[in-house]
Amino acid sequence: CSKRNLERAAQIAASTSVRLQTVTRFDLNITSGILHTAKEYEATSIVIGLHYKTNIVDSFFGSLTENLLKTTHLEVMVARFVMPVNVLRRIIVAVPPKSEFEHGFTKWITHLCRLSGQLGCRVHFYAHPQTLGYIRGFIEKRFKDTRTAYSELEDWDDLLILTGQVNYDHLFVIVSSRRGSISYDSSFEKLPMQISKYFNNNSVMLIYPGQKDDPNENLSFADPRGWAESQYYDKAGNWIYKWFKKNS
């Protein structure tokens, strides 16, 4: 199945004259396979599809996305397209306050400006006035030919106001951030519910900007997901052990 998907991706890329290098890898799990491959090929970004929730206890993002965000400093883009990319008419971007202080701030702007140029569509940014100033300044300096629009989004809690701005043929991009980063806000925890309820029929992309320091610089095959996550397994194991001991 994975081989067929790679072949299909190569065919699609070839039809658009895009160079695509396919890689088949055997590893302990999907997360460690992606991380080791990214390190070997010196990747700067990771793009994955949005997880398809299979049951009621399954999380919105799935374990793959969650593990990647915990164990790599690279930019991670999570996408779900409900129609071919080449028919998208506009890119709507919601940006949280203080995003301009993130290490990967200019990288995701660069990605969106280039995508806008390839699709021939406008990029409309919604952000705090101060953040909008940094976005506008960078684009005017580096991508002045990009068709853009800017609107103020004073409070990130007003994100749902954009439901009336995102149409079926738009790509809705939400710039988020990892827990503990400069622009992180507790309201990000509501994103899965908001996307599922209000943007379920839209093409959506979540961007997690790259971080300066790698949380798992010493990644190894012996500990592919990092020390931080293993702590949670240890705590869970100790709790189960104590519970059984108490009730035995």
Regions found by a protein language model. Name each.
Residues E7, Q11-A13, E40-S45:
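Catalytic cores of nucleotide-enabled group-transfer and carboxylate-activating enzymes in metabolic
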Residues R8, G33, K107-H111, D158:
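Well-ordered alpha-helical segments embedded in enzymatic catalytic cores
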Residues R25-S32:
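Charged docking surfaces used in two-component/phosphorelay signaling
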Residues Q11-S15, I139-K144:
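Short, conserved catalytic or adaptor-binding loops enriched in Gly and charged residues
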Residues A14-T24, R122-V123, T148-Y150:
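Short beta-strand elements in bilobed, periplasmic/extracellular small-molecule ligand-binding domains
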Residues C1-K3:
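Juxtamembrane segments of multi-pass membrane proteins
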Residues L35-A38, L159-N167:
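Short amphipathic alpha-helix with an adjacent loop that forms part of the alpha/beta core around
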Residues T44-S45, L50-G137, F143-E154, N167-L171, ...:
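Intrinsically disordered or low-complexity boundary/linker segments at protein termini
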